[in-house]
Curated annotation (Swiss-Prot):
Compartment list: Cytoplasm
Gene Ontology MF terms in the entry: ATP binding; histidine-tRNA ligase activity
GO BP, one annotated term: histidyl-tRNA aminoacylation
Protein name per UniProt: Histidine--tRNA ligase
Annotated signal sequence range: none
Main location (coarse class): cytoplasm
Catalytic reaction equation(s): tRNA(His) + L-histidine + ATP = L-histidyl-tRNA(His) + AMP + diphosphate + H(+)
Organism: Klebsiella pneumoniae (strain 342)
Length: 424
């Protein structure tokens, strides 16, 4: 017997019992994005490798260790996208969407990173992200954060996430800080772990993000990034904090928050949780005013964020179990008797025409009433429509509320209006 082929490690199937909750969560997220004026953009999952090397940075963990890169049959180097911002910027430049224009875009889809699979961290994962181009003030940064805060309220998880905020300043200010940080770290090379030693010269700001408690202890006396900010970045950050204060959004300034991608400047933020163990980051983003020009476009400010859906689903399940998937079926149509199936299917189409948002499933495969009602219960139906030979002959249908057990007989012409009342 042939050996079963299984999914690749870290790339998961999501079965019907799981996707219903995903759909409800995604629907809520998309509704909020629409209410803020964002439009969807759909992007390829494969891009030219140089796009990510130029955007993310050649000495980042993502580019050095985590990308799925391969040569196609023409010898071109291609990469499965590890994040969404670079592709969104590439598309904006290619299609003339950015220069001297304001754009508010969102995307959703799979991303790929070769990491060690664990709960909340996978090799294929799904992100929803939003990007704003053409606006450089702190007000749009604040509105993006307010949008994410609305997401948490909609999902009932506001009490389980907290906002961390920082400014990493301009490229010039960050270069000055980098020199000061390296000079400080060089005094303690014997106390740094191997990863921090490597990062000290390739991407020293990433040492600030070390998970090693000994390294974090060393950093207590390190130069503070905030002391090296340029005046414009200080004013921008002060404006952002004032807007968040006015909106009642609580935050913590974390001067070690730097993000792992090279394109950020000024604002960086993360929403974090303590409810998912070590995988604490739920949503993260920041400002990238130089990225469009870096990728070949004209200078255009940008700011955005991305959120991993797998981690969000886990968080909702952990802290708000009352947020449940919508039922697969609202109405189940039960038919019994000789030559009733055709009439039942016509009735089902009539109801779907009149109530286009309603999920109606028609029984197929026969079975007595008991078996058909068991199927209705399995699918979570609230209402059963019952037609037999006598109902068809009289032009009627029995409507049964499966929760209360109450049932009534109505004409087929009035069944849609009756259902509309029952379903609210």
């Amino acid at each position: 017997m042939a050996k079963n082929i299984q999914a690749i490690r870290g790339m998961n199937d999501y079965l019907p019992g799981e996707t219903a909750l995903w759909q409800r969560i995604e629907g809520s997220l998309k509704q909020v994005l629409g209410s803020y004026g964002y439009s969807e953009i759909r992007l390829p999952i494969v891009e030219q490798t140089p796009l990510f090397k130029r955007a993310i940075g050649e000495v980042t963990d993502v580019v050095e260790k985590e990308m799925y890169t391969f040569e196609d049959r023409n010898g071109d180097s291609l990469t499965l996208r590890p994040e969404g911002t670079a592709g969104c910027v590439r598309a904006g430049i290619e299609h003339g969407l950015l220069y001297n224009q304001e754009q508010r875009l969102w995307y959703v889809g799979p991303m790929f990173r070769h990491e060690r699979p664990q709960k909340g961290r996978y090799r294929q994962f799904h992100q929803i992200g939003a990007e704003v181009f053409g606006l450089q003030g702190p007000d749009i940064d604040a509105e993006l954060i307010m949008l994410t805060a609305r997401w948490w309220r909609e999902l009932g998880i506001s009490d389980h996430v907290s906002l961390e905020l920082n400014s990493i300043g301009s490229l010039e200010a960050r270069a000055n800080y980098r020199d000061a940080l390296v000079a400080y770290l060089e005094q303690f090379t014997d106390k740094l772990d191997e990863d921090s030693k490597r990062r000290m010269y390739t991407n020293p700001l990433r040492v600030l993000d070390s998970k090693n408690p000994d390294v974090q202890a060393l950093l207590n006396d390190a130069p503070a990034l905030g002391d090296y900010l340029d005046e414009e970045s200080k004013a921008h950050f002060a404006g952002l904090c004032a807007l968040l204060d006015d909106a009642g959004i609580r935050y913590t300034v974390n001067q070690r928050l730097v993000r792992g991608l090279d394109y950020y400047n000024r604002t960086v933020f993360e929403w974090v949780t303590t409810s998912l163990g070590s995988q604490g980051t739920v949503c993260a983003g920041g400002r990238y005013d130089g990225l469009v020009e870096q990728l070949g476009g004209r200078a255009t400010p940008g700011v955005g964020f991305a959120m991993g859906l797998e981690r969000l689903v886990l968080l909702v399940q952990a802290v708000n179990p009352e947020f449940k998937a919508d039922p697969v079926v609202d109405i189940y149509l039960v038919a019994s008797g000789t030559d009733t199936q055709s009439a039942a299917m016509r009735l089902a189409e009539q109801v779907r025409d009149a109530l286009p948002g309603v999920k109606l499933m028609t029984n197929h495969g026969g079975g007595n009433f008991k078996k058909q009602f068991a199927r209705a219960d399995k699918w979570g139906a609230r209402i059963a429509l019952v037609v037999g030979e006598s109902e068809i002959a009289d032009g009627n249908v029995v409507v049964k509320d499966l929760r209360s057990g109450e049932q009534t007989t109505v004409t087929q012409e009035s069944v849609a209006a009756h259902l509309r009342t029952l379903l609210g």
